[in-house]
Amino acid sequence: QATRLMMLIDGKIREVNLNEKIIYETIVPDVAKFSMYGSELAFVKKLNADKKFVISIFKLRDMGEIKIDEVDESVGINQIFVNLTEFYGEKYLNTVIGQSLRVYSTDDYPNHDNENTSLNLALEKTLEAVPSEFYTSANGEFFMGVSGNKVMLVNLELMELLQFEHNNNTIRQLDYYLMFDVVDGKMQVYDFDHDNQRTILEKVADGFDAVINHNNRYLYYVGTNDSGLQIKRDKLF
């Protein structure tokens, strides 16, 4: 909810109520990093006594976490990523350990109320490089990562991994199937597979997101003029 969020505070996932300015009790302790989608959390716990990072998931209000995998300490925490999403009624868990990528699918994540649910390995690939970041796209349809100028993208509809070179690591999502970048003040748009490049706008400021409104009629972005920066709107059709 907009007034309640999850934060990692001193290695503890805690719920924060922004309206009442309350930080609730710890939900999960000893966490190094986490991601969230809906009411589910996926996280990597700090090194345990066995020198392992533990990847787990947790459904809010459940009795406890469910362990998914263990990772040896030889793999640094900055090379481990976990992400969740839901697409067309199917739920997905993505793990990246070094260059090893896995995508699991399920009708419902395992939890203590229904331990019969299971994760199905839908995709397993070796990445061409260790990513510096890996995340769920804004529309929940892709898992995306970057390593220098290399972009890695998991298309959940086709359940395939795409890897391609871009001229920088600032390419990002514009809408469901489009990605964009700003090069020399021009907004360049690409299909999700990096094909069909075209320039759609000029005098665009770099370093800012751009969004298309809900009915796909207007594009909002940060432009430049003689006075500096300005929020602009362009009609798409």
Regions from the PLM with identified roles:
Residues 1-2, 13:
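N-terminal "mature head" segments of proteins
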Residues 6-9, 18, 33-45, 90:
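Secretory/export targeting leaders with adjacent low-complexity proregions
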Residues 88-102:
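Charge-rich, low-complexity intrinsically disordered segments
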Residues 1, 27-40, 74-86, 122-138, ...:
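Repeated scaffold domains used in trafficking and secretory/extracellular systems
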Residues 3-4, 90-92, 141-142, 177-178:
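Structural hallmark of WD40 beta-propellers
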Residues 207-237:
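Blade-level signature of beta-propeller repeat domains, shared across WD40, Kelch, NHL, RCC1
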Residues 8-27, 50-75, 98-128, 146-165, ...:
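Surface-exposed loop/turn elements that mediate protein-protein interactions on large endomembrane-trafficking
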